[in-house]
């Protein structure tokens, strides 16, 4: 995944840029960078590896030595960026968020026009560099950005820093957000809407799907109007988005309360009577509060996340490291576990590894029962549109492994759709088998129709591909 932030100022933008980028640290833990432009000294750029140290620690020096009236920066979980490019458009810096599924095909086309690339350490091309090369195929930034949006299969949002202003372009189907902020001496563009609030900016507006704007210290100009079709990622509300953020006017925190509330309504007729409701911190917390408020069952924190040093556990490259982080960052409160029946809400079940270990950890700490309520439907399809996971195969999903076991072979699309239907016999068999394998006392997933209701916008505007396979 990843996130970005850009700012302009009549004075120096680096303070705002530094903290605006830092507020995206929940979206990645591998690379981070900042690029600035000053009318007197030109461009400056810094990129650091943040796998073993947070953004603020790595960029403290740059926050004091870099200067500029405009700048962009990013947290990236894949490639090093922003990159600095010199072309017929002049010198510019670019940062992107998205996923390019047809990179090899595009690469051949671009190379045929005499472009060349530097390989990354793993032998692959930097996707942001590829986007820059696509843009350079056209006569100006507007045509270049539109060309990139047109030919990229997957998703693509970007910020481009030039001497005249910052271009902000949202993905053509709005799969990821870009929101603008305004204060007296400039503007900003941000992936997360909360990232600029403590910096003195006020909400200005969100970009629509495919919309392109350019802004400087004085104004924001629309260059390409937004399209009518949107497919924003629903998983942003479920997990990735920070609780204080909002997308399309819908609060992440409130949406998670709604999820918990609707989960509790589905449980009312079941013979499940836990002593307390808890959430797997941090993303499961709001879901659990919503459940507790609706059900009347007390909310508790049977384990506490040690936040000062442990990052999100999906980020490290190796599964063993992810599992270690998942274990080490949660500290038990035995008085709230021993002899208790617990209902635990997590944002999702992907591989099943971490939640199974959490469940065993609770049993080992004296829990009588552990009822699991994921806050989204079963994940049946790998995401085609965003770099949400390091998974290289859909068979890493626990659902797909269980379905193959039940079917005796790899299922076709129509069979998977049967398993996606929460009212089908196949769906219930899959859920029962997952419950058995994971040693849960009971398991009930959030239904897709309830999830869509939890968000509260037009269902046609939501991407739900990872749950139902519908593009």
Where are the regions that the model predicts?
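Long, K/E/R/D-enriched contiguous segments that form extended
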Residues: 274-311
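Flexible loop/turn segments at secondary-structure boundaries
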Residues: 12-14, 102, 167, 175-176, ...
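Short, glycine/charge-rich flexible loops or terminal/linker lids adjacent to PRPP-binding catalytic cores
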Residues: 296-341, 380-392
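Conserved short alpha-helical segments that host acidic/polar catalytic motifs at enzyme active sites
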Residues: 1-208, 214-275, 280, 369
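A conserved beta-strand->alpha-helix junction
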Residues: 121-129, 134, 299-312, 405-413, ...
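PRPP-dependent phosphoribosyltransferase catalytic core
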Residues: 164-165, 200-206, 359-471
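Phosphate/diphosphate-binding loops
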Residues: 195, 202, 207-211, 260, ...
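Secondary-structure transition/capping motifs at alpha-helix termini
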Residues: 268-274, 293-300, 334-338, 360-369
């Amino acid at each position: 995944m990843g996130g970005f932030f850009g700012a302009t100022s009549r004075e120096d933008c680096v303070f705002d840029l530094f903290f605006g980028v830092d507020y995206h640290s929940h979206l990645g833990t591998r690379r981070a960078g900042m690029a600035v432009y000053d009318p007197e000294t030109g461009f400056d750029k810094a990129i650091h590896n943040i796998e073993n140290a947070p953004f603020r620690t790595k960029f403290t020096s740059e926050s004091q030595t870099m200067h500029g009236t405009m700048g962009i920066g990013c947290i990236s979980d894949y490639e090093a960026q922003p990159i600095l490019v010199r072309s017929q458009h002049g010198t510019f810096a670019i940062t992107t968020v998205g996923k390019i599924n047809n990179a090899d095909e595009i690469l051949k086309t671009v190379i045929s026009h005499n472009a060349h690339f530097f390989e990354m350490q793993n032998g692959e091309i930097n996707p942001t560099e590829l986007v820059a090369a696509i843009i350079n195929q056209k006569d100006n930034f507007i045509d270049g950005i539109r060309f990139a949006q047109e030919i990229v299969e997957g998703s693509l949002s970007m910020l481009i820093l030039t001497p005249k202003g910052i271009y902000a372009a949202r993905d053509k189907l709005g799969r990821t957000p870009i929101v603008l902020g305004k204060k007296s001496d400039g503007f900003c563009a941000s992936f997360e809407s909360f990232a600029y609030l403590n910096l003195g900016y006020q909400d200005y507006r969100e970009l629509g799907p495919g919309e392109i704007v350019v802004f400087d210290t004085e104004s924001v100009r629309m260059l390409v109007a937004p399209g009518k079709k949107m497919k924003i990622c629903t998983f942003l509300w479920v997990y990735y988005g920070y609780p204080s953020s909002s997308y399309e006017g819908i609060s992440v925190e409130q949406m998670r309360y709604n999820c918990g509330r609707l989960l509790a309504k589905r449980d009312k007729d079941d013979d499940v009577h836990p002593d307390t409701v808890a959430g797997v911190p941090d993303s499961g917390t709001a879901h659990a509060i919503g459940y507790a408020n609706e059900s009347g069952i007390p909310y508790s924190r049977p384990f506490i996340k040690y936040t000062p040093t442990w990052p999100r556990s999906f980020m490290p490259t190796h599964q063993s490291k992810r599992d270690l982080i998942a274990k080490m960052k949660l500290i038990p409160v035995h008085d709230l576990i021993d002899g208790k029946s617990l209902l635990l809400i997590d944002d999702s079940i992907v591989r099943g590894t971490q939640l199974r270990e959490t469940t065993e950890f609770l049993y080992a700490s004296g829990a009588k029962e552990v009822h699991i309520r994921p806050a989204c439907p079963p994940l049946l399809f790998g995401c085609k549109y965003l770099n949400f996971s390091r998974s290289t195969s859909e068979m890493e999903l626990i659902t797909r492994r269980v379905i193959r076991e039940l079917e005796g072979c790899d299922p076709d699309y129509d069979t998977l759709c049967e398993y996606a239907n929460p009212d089908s016999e196949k769906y219930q068999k899959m859920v029962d088998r997952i419950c058995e394998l994971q040693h849960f006392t009971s398991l009930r997933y959030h239904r897709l129709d309830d999830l869509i209701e939890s968000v509260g916008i037009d269902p046609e505007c939501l991407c739900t591909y990872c749950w139902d396979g519908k593009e």
